[in-house]
Amino acid sequence: MRRELLLEKIETYKAIMPWYVLDYYQSKLAIPYSFTTLYEYLKEYKRFFDWLMDADLTQAPKIADIDLSTLEHLTKKDLEAFVLYLRERPSLNTYSTKEGLSQTTINRTLSALSSLYKYLTEEVENDQGEPYFYRNVMKKVSTKKKKETLASRAENIKQKLFLGDETLAFLDYVDKEYEQKLSNRAKSSFRKNKERDLAIIALLLASGVRLSEAVNLDLKDVNLNMMIIEVIRKGGKRDSVNVAGFAKGYLESYLAVRQRRYKAEKQDLAFFLTEYRGVPNRMDASSIEKMVGKYSEDFKIRVTPHKLRHTLATRLYDATKSQVLVSHQLGHSSTQVTDLYTHIVNDEQKNALDNL
């Protein structure tokens, strides 16, 4: 969603939250957590607080009145009842036949709660320099993770990557072929944003940055002479990221039309812009996800921006066989996360089996 709309929704949630959640929000904003992450966490807290009231685990008449002692004295059994509620509640998605939330969604909810409890029991300080309370019930609640070997995950992901010549073929398809099947009205919209869309896709494929990192790019963060961009990684760390040379032409073409086409002024700092009723705005994550999905589905298979990150990582490992280099490019502090890419490009095992 647009940044302005996102901030409006955040303010709506903040208006109904207890004071300690507002403290938490302010603390995480200073790290900084992205507005998208904080918005998702606030949604999860509302879901949890609504359940506390429905389950009569608090006498508070509204969410803002739920006090700290309620959270402090919740039992493991209470939290397990909440998880059961999430698993069995009717789905609000009219396109889904499932009765409850997916395990991935449940894990996300529990992750948000764990973050809040850790803040309240370890990170925050009251007037005496102590946390608000010490009992962290979330440490007793286990999450169920999807069981899958790295080899299995790699094989599933591989089908959704644009490896080898497909990276440039995808860009070439959007540039030269996609327009041919559009109506005249659709062509007009496509042509307006063509350079920008190609620049975004090229940057994701050439750098492997996260979607949030691309969204938050400002003009000052992009150095096309050096082909380096400055991003804010998870945890608020600033990082310099190298960008593959094939993206340069696409980025330059976008910059050549950015000011005129999106009516950008000096105060419009965002690198990737959208324009609505003559007003330029930072392009948001949801719009980029939809854009990438639209083009990729027409080319081969619908993918997310994160799969473009996987594509870059896999191609880089295939070229260098260096997990350290790949982990640095992706902004990971450990090579453990990059084990996946060794499985995606590891054809030696298959070749050995073929020779049996």
Curated annotation (Swiss-Prot):
Record carries keyword Cell membrane: no
Record's function text: Site-specific tyrosine recombinase, which acts by catalyzing the cutting and rejoining of the recombining DNA molecules. Essential to convert dimers of the bacterial chromosome into monomers to permit their segregation at cell division.
Ranges where the Tyr recombinase domain occurs: 169-354
Activity regulation description: FtsK is required for recombination.
UniProt key word Cytoplasm: yes
GO cellular component, as recorded: cytoplasm
Active site: 210, 234, 306, 309, 332, 341 (o-(3'-phospho-dna)-tyrosine intermediate)
Domain of life from the UniProt record: Bacteria
MF terms in GO: DNA binding; tyrosine-based site-specific recombinase activity
Name of protein: Tyrosine recombinase XerS
Primary localization class, coarse: cytoplasm
Compartment annotation: Cytoplasm
Keywords attached to this entry: Cell cycle, Cell division, Chromosome partition, Cytoplasm, DNA integration, DNA recombination, DNA-binding
InterPro entries named in the record: CB, DNA_brk_join_enz, Integrase-like_cat_sf, Integrase_catalytic, Integrase_recombinase_N, Integrase_SAM-like_N, Recomb_XerS, Tyrosine_recombinase_XerCD
Record family assignment: Belongs to the 'phage' integrase family. XerS subfamily.
One record GO biological process: cell division
Domain Core-binding (CB): 16-121
HAMAP family, alphabetized: Recomb_XerS
Cross-referenced CDD domains: DNA_BRE_C
Gene: xerS
